[in-house]
């Protein structure tokens, strides 16, 4: 088995991408998953549970957090982060830093939900994909890496890291989604079924 890797450094935005490829003894090239955390973790009692219509605010409140004007509080008067969905990401968060998204992205991307942790200075982009039949959502899953790069350009401007997460329903446990789920992990993104573990978000 042979290991090859390449490193791409973007000097404008100062982030690094590492691509790893493993070839087995039969000469077949196989991707190695860089992500070791996501990838379909089992649901548990210490997670934020989602359904198709569930808002992050409601999921946080179910776990004892207080969400007020997009700020998230837990056991104190000092906010631990922000919950900003859709346009609120820009009007409630980026405007505080006088950041115009057009300086970084040609289009304004509006996530289903986003949790921004002040503790570890990380933005968790959350996209919910729930379906009961094959359809256009399949292709949207494959766009995860592009969307991750777009958000990285935005958040790196203020020194924040970016994590891109899919919350999927059980439909995506079907065998035909194995390759796309592997691809999501390989591209440095994450997915969970129905629930995001609290510790994954630093809560």
Segments and roles (model prediction):
Residues 66-120:
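Active-site metal-binding core of divalent-cation-utilizing nuclease and nuclease-like domains
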Residues 24-30, 149, 171-203:
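Non-catalytic C-terminal interaction segments of nucleic acid-processing enzymes
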Residues 125, 167, 192-194:
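A structural signal for short, well-ordered beta-strand segments and their strand-loop junctions
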Residues 121-123, 130-184:
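Catalytic cores of nucleic-acid endonucleases
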Residues 66, 158-161, 190:
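Short coil/loop linkers at secondary-structure junctions
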Residues 1-77, 88-89:
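Nuclease-adjacent, charged terminal/linker segments that flank catalytic cores
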């Amino acid at each position: 088995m042979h290991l090859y890797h390449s490193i791409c450094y973007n000097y404008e935005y100062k982030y690094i991408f590492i691509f790893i490829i493993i070839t087995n003894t039969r000469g077949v090239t196989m991707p190695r998953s860089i992500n070791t955390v996501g990838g379909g973790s089992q649901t548990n009692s210490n997670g934020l549970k989602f359904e198709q219509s569930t808002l992050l605010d409601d999921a946080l409140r179910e776990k004892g957090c207080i969400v007020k004007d997009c700020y998230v509080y837990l056991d104190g008067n000092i906010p631990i982060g922000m919950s900003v969905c859709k346009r609120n990401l820009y009007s409630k968060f980026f405007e505080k830093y006088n950041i115009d998204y057009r300086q970084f992205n040609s289009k304004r991307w509006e996530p289903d939900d986003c949790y921004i942790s002040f503790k570890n200075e990380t933005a968790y982009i959350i996209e919910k994909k729930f379906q009961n039949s094959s359809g256009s959502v399949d292709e949207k899953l494959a766009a995860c890496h592009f969307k991750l790069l777009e958000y990285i350009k935005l958040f790196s401007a203020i020194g924040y890291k970016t994590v891109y997460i899919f919350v999927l329903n059980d439909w995506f446990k079907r065998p035909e989604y194995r390759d796309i789920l592997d691809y999501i992990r390989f591209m440095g993104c994450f997915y969970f079924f129905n629930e995001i573990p609290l510790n994954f978000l630093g809560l």
